[in-house]
Amino acid sequence: LAAVDCSEYPKPACTMEHRPLCGSDNQTYDNKCNFCNAVVESNGTLTLSHFGKC
């Protein structure tokens, strides 16, 4: 099972870094920062499906 440490999020701004990950919502996030911000907003219901595009 893939995991990402989101303990230092949310952050007010994310870089444009392109390292896609796929969330459990079947949405592709551009990078860890965007993904982790979404995880925080979802109150932890969003998880990582896998690294790379969905």
Swiss-Prot record:
Glycans are attached at residue 43. Pfam families: Kazal_1. The keyword tRNA-binding does not apply. Disulfide bonds join 6-36, 14-33, 22-54. Residues 4-54 form the Kazal-like domain. GO terms for cellular component: extracellular region. The keyword Ribosomal protein does not apply. Its main location: secreted. The record marks 16-17 as: Reactive bond 3. It is found in: Secreted. Avian ovomucoid consists of three homologous, tandem Kazal family inhibitory domains. This is Ovomucoid. It comes from Guttera pucherani.
